[in-house]
Regions:
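FAD-binding core/adjacent interface of flavoenzyme oxidoreductases
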Residues: 2, 26-30, 35-85, 100-101, ...
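Glycine-rich FAD pyrophosphate-binding loop
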Residues: 103-119, 247-255
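Residue-level detector of alpha-helix initiation sites
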Residues: 23, 88-90, 113, 229-231
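A Rossmann-like FAD-binding core segment of flavoenzymes
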Residues: 132-181, 198, 204-214, 241-306
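Predominantly flavin-linked oxidoreductase catalytic cores and closely associated redox partners
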Residues: 208, 213-226, 230-246
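Long amphipathic alpha-helical segments
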Residues: 1-29, 33
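N-terminal Rossmann-like FAD-binding beta1-loop-alpha1 element of flavoenzymes
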Residues: 80-106, 232-240
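Short glycine-enriched, charge-decorated loop/helix-capping segments at active-site entrances
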Residues: 121-127
Length: 306
């Protein structure tokens, strides 16, 4: 396998092996939750530390990008065509695998940039856009995958038309989960309340991560992010970089945080405050409709639900 090839110093061979099963190794090596996936299944982790599979995947993926390793092998074209809706990680992985199997593949992306959550959602400090994402997408295109942006399936074209007059044999829908979920508490409509999805999209689109850009994003002096997942960590760490005093509010204890341990560790290193066992009940505002505070109640853990 690829780890054996790394041990032997055969990095080109390692890249060839990993490319057979991983379409975006440099991306996955950075942002996937390895501790609950590949590394979580490593038997060495029973008594000690598991093999750092994610870090090795990242190294091999980056080596492949830097050294221009040969593109993955593809089967002869079978004459069948598949339309892929969405250019996020699911769409890119699907398109890559199908192209390797000999299918003609075209990705339709609604927005003007390719990459989905890799470009609009995950911050630059976790996933470099030009150095990593753009080059991984170029690797997918090297397999013969076509990509068309600014196409809203359902408006510009329809699934029926893709399967009909456009001549596709199948359609893969990988449109993502872009709609946010709110808490349903009073005050959520106040100015200054935004979903993490919107905040991160604005930050990435407006290049808030680049010091040379004057980014017109409203960030208060004190920012509270409600939640404890990876998106919450991305949002709170982005707010910190934009100059805010940033705090995580989470209804359970640190042990129950769904975010990766690595992300929580980085957030603490950067000075993010954590208010655990704290649950918001209302967003407070002034007479002009702007946020002034967050009313919360203290929680305590009970027995797990059946």
């Amino acid at each position: 396998d690829f780890i054996h090839q790394v041990v032997e110093g055969n990095f080109a061979a390692a890249a060839a092996v990993i490319s057979e099963d991983s379409s975006l190794p440099s991306v996955c090596g950075r942002v996937c939750p390895q501790e609950s996936q590949c590394e979580g299944s490593c038997i060495l982790g029973i008594k000690s530390e598991p093999v750092a599979i994610g870090k090795l995947e990242r190294f091999v993926g980056d080596w492949k990008l830097e050294h221009g390793a040969a593109a993955s092998r593809t089967a002869p074209r079978n004459g069948r065509r598949v339309a892929v809706i969405g250019s996020g990680p699911a769409g890119l992985a699907c398109a890559s695998d199908l192209a390797k199997m000999g299918y003609g593949v075209k990705i339709f992306e609604a927005l003007h940039k390719v990459g989905g959550v890799l470009v609009y959602g995950i911050p630059e400090f976790r996933l470099p856009k030009q150095r990593i994402v753009a080059r991984e997408i170029a690797e997918v295109e090297r397999l013969g995958v076509e990509i068309e942006t600014d196409v809203i399936v359902g408006r510009t074209v329809t699934v029926d038309s893709l399967l009909g007059e456009e001549g596709y044999d199948a359609v893969f829908i990988g449109s993502g989960a872009g709609l946010p979920r709110f808490m349903g508490i009073p005050g959520e409509n106040l100015n200054g309340v935004v979903s993490a999805n919107e905040f991160l999209t604005r930050a990435n689109l407006m290049r808030a991560y680049d010091d040379t850009y004057d980014t017109p994003i409203y960030v208060g002096k004190r920012v509270v992010v409600v939640g404890g997942g990876n998106v919450a960590m991305d949002a709170v760490r982005t707010a910190k970089r934009l100059g805010a005093e940033a705090t995580i509010v989470y209804r359970r204890s640190e042990k129950e945080l769904p975010a990766r341990v690595e992300e929580v560790h980085h957030a603490k290193e950067e000075g993010i405050r954590f208010r655990m066992l704290t649950n918001p009940t209302a967003v407070l505002g002034d007479e002009k409709g702007w946020v002034t505070g967050l009313r919360c109640v203290e929680m305590e853990l009970g027995e797990p639900d059946e």
